[in-house]
Structure formats: structure tokens, C-alpha cells
Amino acid sequence: FVQFWDGRAEDLEAQAKGPVVNPIEMGMESPKAVEAKLGGVESYKAQFASAFPNDKRALSFNNVAKAIAAFERTLVSPSRYDKWISGDKAALTPQEQRGLHTFINAGCIACHSGTTFGGSMYQKLGLVNPYPSADAGRFAVTKDPADSLMFKVPSLRNVAVTWPYFHDGSVRTLKEAIRLMAWHQVGNKLNDNEVASIEIFLKSLTNEKITATHTKTIASKM
């Protein structure tokens, strides 16, 4: 599916080009500046030549995006939920299983579905109860009034460790995100026990193998 909250990137390759030259993210001046920066690392030049042997300019901005996208596609997130859905009924606690039922009964599953629990559709923010947002969402891309406040539904994989939440980063806690989404999207005023139950389940979607990885030599040369 498309990338970014407003769907302005059609695939991972297009997405990978954005943050690098975005002035409020990585802030590189231009694609040429990216090529020059990476071209200053001898090992990168050799690796790109090996990865793209048919290209006269192996270390190009397009190929940088292709390489990043290829890496991103290797990022899978095995979780205890996956063990449970595959037949290991002890993988989730009774509390987490109740949380799944609450998640479904509250209506969350209508948008956050599939193996990724979202990430494959757009939805209007404030579908039932209006949500105050200065960001027009997909409308900024399409200029179609029907796309006003339409955003990509995010995946809930690793949601417990990827705060802040929402397109504007305005929500700091998972509990508050659950409470607000239930109200604005499906019109449910969840009580504290229901919010806590859903939160317990969502934590079971965290990748058990999340570890910090570090490059050994490249970072010091950048």
C-alpha cells in the first residue's frame, strides 16, 4: 500500500527518498548531495557497484532508495500474537485474549485488520465525532474534497513502542490514543477497564526480537 499518512509516496522506494531531503528530518540539500555524501565512503561505492552491476552510476539517488526499500522489506515483526494465531494457545495470557475480544467488540478491527492490523486503507479522521486537525490529510495530495481528513490507517504492529501517536504526534500515551480513536472513529466512550484491556492486547503485537543494531564503521565516516 501507499506510504506516509497522506499517501503521497506510492511505494517504499518513493518513501525512502522523502526523509533524506526533508529539511525537518535528515535535511540533505538535494539528491546530488546525498550521492556525494555516500560516495565519500569507499565501502559504499563497492557495495553499490556489486548490488547494481548493470548501472553506469551504481551509487545514484534512485539506487539509494532501492537499497533502503530492499532493507525495509526484510523488517518483519514476529510477536507472541503470531505464535498464538499459529496455534500456540499459551502464547497469549487470558488477559491478552480478553483484550483481543474487547478490541474486536469496540470496533477497532474495522480499520485495523489483516496481518498488519492496519496499513492497507485510508479512513477519515473523525469519522463519527469530529477531530480537530489543521492537517487536511490526503486532500493535500489529491485536492479532492472527498479526501479531506483522510489518512492512511497505521499498522498497530509495535504500537506500544512507537509513540507519539496520530499523524500530528499529539498523543503521548497508548491509553489516550485508544480512548480518542474509539470516540472519534466509532463513537464509543470506553471505560478505563476497556481501555486497559485493549492496551494489554496491543502490547502482544510487539516484536519479541527488537534489538538495537549498530554499524561498526560506517557511522564514524559519515
Task: Label the model's feature ranges.
Residues 1-222:
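Periplasmic c-type cytochrome electron-transfer domains
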